[in-house]
Amino acid sequence: SDLVKEINSETGIDIISTILLKKAKKMHLDSIDLDTENLLDFSKFPDNAIAMSVVLEHEEFTEEINWATKVHSGWYDAYFQILFYDFSDQSLIASIPFDFEIRMLSEEKYNKKIVLDKVRDFYLHDSPFDKLDNKINQFNIKRKYDRRIGITQIDIQDRAFEKMPVEYKKKQNVIKNLIAQSFAERLSSVHNVAIVPYVEGQAIGKAMKLRFVQSDDIYDLKLANPDYQIHI
């Protein structure tokens, strides 16, 4: 997102992360003692710390026109993961997926500036992360889990792509990730279970790459092999 390039002068980080940071400092978590003083300082993390990160995994914008009314409809979708992991060895403990959608209407065709202005306004004024602590409190976050569940494989038949826009066939991994994220978010919400994130070609020892707003370093977050594997 171009919005992560827009730096807030007070915090020194992008505007989306700034909103998240302000929310994190006001969170009321039932079973987690959140250190709100050192949220961005890795050097202050004790060796046995469980770290929490909110990750923007994917975002997209789609548009269609109603030829009868000449009105353009737009949808901005953002897909996130709330990750809990052992900071000492960067191994995943739990993941909670969530997403949201912004719907737009316009008499003019959307361009990049219009979309960015609407998305920026949404992040700044509509408080998309306001219920983040309520979502986390639905789960019993533990350092270890006896059993884990996750999507390990997604198969899309060629005839399905024939019904999609041509460019989708060139982005099969993106489509698979969207399907996995959408399914995992609903599964997680309905059953209050944390999910092992989907990674294309999931295998034992697989890792998810993370880059934090306060560092240029890229971390490999080790993922557990799900005991209960979902094949879509």
PLM segments and residue spans:
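Charged/polar interaction segments and conserved charged motifs
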Residues: 1-31, 81-83, 94, 106-108, ...
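N-terminal segment of the mature soluble domain
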Residues: 1-55, 162-232
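Elongated alpha-helical scaffolds
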Residues: 47-62, 71-84
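Charged, low-complexity, helix/coiled-coil-prone segments
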Residues: 54-70, 115-130
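Low-complexity, intrinsically disordered or weakly predicted helical/coil tracts enriched
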Residues: 56, 64-73, 86, 91, ...
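Amphipathic beta-strand/beta-sheet edge segments enriched in Tyr/Trp
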Residues: 67-106, 229-232
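Sequence-level detector for tyrosine residue identity
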Residues: 75-79, 85, 110, 123, ...
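C-terminal/domain-edge helix-coil "capping" segments
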Residues: 87-163, 171, 175-185, 191
